[in-house]
Amino acid sequence: MLFRSAGMTAEEITRSFLSQSISGVVIYGMSKEDKVLQKLIREKQFACVVVDAPIVNSRTTYIRIDQEQAQYDVAKKTVLDDNCKRVLYIAGRRDGYVTDQRLKGMKRLVKDLDLTMMVRQGDFSELTARNVALKYAKNKDVVVCASDLMAIGAMNALIDMDIFRPVCGFDGITLMGYVGKQMNTIRQDFYSISSRAVEEVHQLMNGGEGHQVV
């Protein structure tokens, strides 16, 4: 089943799960400020698998995707293809674990290729990224976005300004095929990630110890 925890306490979530005989949970999109889910994990009442949030205990497994290298690779291809030097990087949410990892990849790229980079938060929002691009993209050579949705917003801003800048995204979502402009992105295999997460939940429910999976 799918479950959204917004507005609920850890105790309310626990009661809801127990009433439905739920004993294993896969958690996506957890932020550093999500105290409710962090408490749920600490209490160890459920077998938990967290995707892209570095938390491990005896009842919790962490599935880590190499966000840093993936961001590095897609941005490097875009930068080198167009001989860019000045980068506008539109990052995700400030409190996101993946935001830190992807930004780390960008900082490594800037150092390796002797680039300059301006970083602005896009909050994984198409509209916010569009506004950032409208304000800053004109004086940059390339726009690198930490999600495809933000890349779409940035591209729409460039179209509105009638200027060309290469844009790349991250995730490989289906919508990228409908933008009308070619953009680099990196596909995340959500099906394989989710399948592995379910396998890990079953292992925990059968007495396995929590660990990190890359």
Q: How does the language model describe each region?
A:
Residues 3-10, 63-73, 89-111, 115-132, ...:
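Hinge/beta->alpha junction and helix N-cap segments in small-molecule ligand-binding domains
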Residues 27, 50, 88-89, 119:
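Structural beta-sheet core signal
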Residues 77-87:
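Glycine-rich phosphate/diphosphate-binding loops that line cofactor/substrate pockets in enzymes
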